């Protein structure tokens, strides 16, 4: 079986590296056909149109936060859902054409997000260069190979792909930087619950005082931990926003399902973007186990309904 996965190209991007990691971890039993595109929006549109089975897109960076083009594209239209996530460590190589004199570098290119992650190095080593933004880091490397710019910051693999010379390796202003990528397909049955999951929703609220507080209270009352909340303009009127929320838990967890059901009653619009296994970095722990404790409490009540009256155990 062959599946097509759209990703921010060309070959050599961190997104491509995430794609192959998904192939290993999430899609091991299929043949993957990569489909390079020019933006996260194009990758998601390829899924909606059926031109791709999945899209691999960056969603959050540990240094710069949310990847807003991805959030906007996820909310732009229905029909897509997240089925997995993975983390990629981010370091850059500085590259140029082999015959080029590094002392004469005048133009420098990379993706705008990447620029922020190598800004200190560039300021120290290339203080006079003009920045030329690229649609991706690998596209910047391609521009160097084609002679349109003098140097680029990109994954080191891009230098091999475009026959460039690496003049500096392992460049990162913040050590330990990493980016979370998600695998997005057409809407369907969510991934099975694992007990360590993430769920995402997008919603709009009526323009009344207290509506956001009320919406978030539905999660707090049920002990559902939010791992991220972002607001993005609806692009219809000034001052109108949609909210993106990630939470720890699965739609099959009773507290999560109850919170989302209550949220539905409060919202003008609510989109469920899926529940999927969380990718934890080494040493990272789930911030609390409230959802698990509430599930334990529900099971305790069910035993009473069956006439099996258990002794209540005090919380640890």
Task: Label each residue range with its predicted role.
Residues 1-316:
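Domain-level signature for soluble enzymes in the chorismate/prephenate branch of the shikimate pathway
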């Amino acid at each position: 079986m062959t599946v097509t996965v759209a990703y921010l190209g060309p070959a050599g991007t961190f997104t491509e590296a995430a794609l192959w990691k998904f192939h290993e971890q999430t899609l091991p039993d299929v043949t993957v056909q990569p489909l390079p595109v020019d933006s996260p929006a194009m990758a998601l549109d390829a899924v909606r149109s059926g031109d791709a089975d999945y899209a691999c897109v960056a969603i959050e960076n540990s240094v710069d936060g949310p990847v807003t083009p991805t959030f906007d594209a996820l909310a732009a239209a229905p029909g897509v859902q997240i089925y997995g996530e993975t983390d990629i460590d981010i370091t850059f190589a500085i590259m140029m054409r082999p015959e080029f004199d590094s002392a004469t570098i005048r133009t420098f290119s990379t993706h705008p997000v990447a620029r922020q992650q190598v800004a200190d190095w560039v300021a120290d080593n290339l203080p006079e260069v003009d920045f030329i933004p690229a649609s991706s880091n690998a596209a910047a490397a391609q521009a160097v190979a084609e002679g349109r710019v003098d140097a680029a910051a990109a994954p080191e693999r891009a230098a091999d792909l475009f026959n460039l010379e690496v003049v500096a390796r392992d460049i990162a202003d913040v050590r330990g930087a990493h980016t979370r990528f998600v695998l997005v397909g057409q809407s369907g049955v969510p991934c099975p619950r694992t007990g360590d999951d993430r769920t995402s929703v997008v919603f709009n609220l009526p323009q009344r005082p207290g509506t956001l507080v009320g919406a978030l209270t539905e999660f707090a009352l049920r002990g559902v931990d939010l791992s991220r909340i972002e607001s993005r303009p609806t692009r219809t009127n000034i001052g109108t926003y949609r909210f993106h929320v990630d939470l720890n838990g699965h739609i099959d967890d009773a507290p999560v399902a109850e919170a989302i059901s209550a949220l539905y009653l409060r919202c003008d619009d609510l989109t469920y973007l899926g529940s999927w296994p969380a990718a934890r970095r080494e040493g990272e722990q789930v911030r609390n186990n409230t959802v698990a404790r509430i599930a334990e409490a529900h099971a305790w009540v069910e035993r009473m309904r069956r006439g099996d009256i258990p002794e209540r155990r005090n919380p640890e």
